[in-house]
Amino acid sequence: AQKADVDFIIQLGDFSYPKDTSTCLCAPEKMPINLKYAMECPTEIPKLEILNKFNLFSKPKYHLLGNHECDFCSKADALEMYGMEKPYYSFHLKGWQFIVLDGNSYRDEHGDLVDYNFGKYFETTDLPYLGEQQLVWLREEVLSATEPIVIFSHQPLYACPRGLRNVDDLQKLIREGRAAGKRIQFCMNCHVHRDIRHFENGILYYTLNSISNYW
């Protein structure tokens, strides 16, 4: 990034674990194998090395929460680790508006939306969600925009098996923005561990692969 002299960098989540990976609230029978391995990793083994290198970049740098940031800590702890004030936000750069979303919420047994927290989300399949307040905020951001828009998220923003459970609410909002002449140009996510290009309503949705590739 330094050599290419890019205008900014952003990581799209599942980027770093906290230093201590010994505490997880997920029931053992629901726990995926990668969490079990992480829990066995000694605290003294560096886990923030890549994050520290990322933060050395001399130009603007931005973070986004993935689900795995909350495997061994609360969402508040994950935000603190990345120096983020809020889990979703927007920024402007060189005539573009960039929107960063947070899809790390699930519905509990009472039907309430709950933040991912110490791996507890692995006990349910009713996920992921954008919260109602976030959707209201996003609608205001889109309808007040005067610049072309790029949306970043961890989970896909189009209908697919690993995408948002309330993707219809999001897509309705996007269609409303497009009908109002708002220039939503591009949406980018990861989470799926594959490279995917998806076109819908004139918008390119790009899923970025992971270093570990598909598994």
Predicted segments — roles?
Residues 1-11, 16-22:
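N-terminal carbohydrate-binding/catalytic regions of secreted carbohydrate-active enzymes
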Residues 9-11, 63, 151, 188:
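Residue-level marker for buried hydrophobic side chains located in beta-strands
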Residues 11-15, 140-160:
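Short acidic, glycine-rich surface-loop motifs adjacent to enzyme active sites
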Residues 13-14, 66-67, 154, 190-191:
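Active-site glycine-centered loops adjacent to acidic/histidine catalytic or metal-binding residues
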Residues 18-19, 72, 158-161:
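Short, solvent-exposed loop/turn segments at secondary-structure junctions
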Residues 21-144, 169-185, 194-214:
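Extended active-site neighborhood of metal-dependent phosphoesterases/phosphodiesterases
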Residues 151-156, 187-195:
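Histidine-centered catalytic micro-motifs
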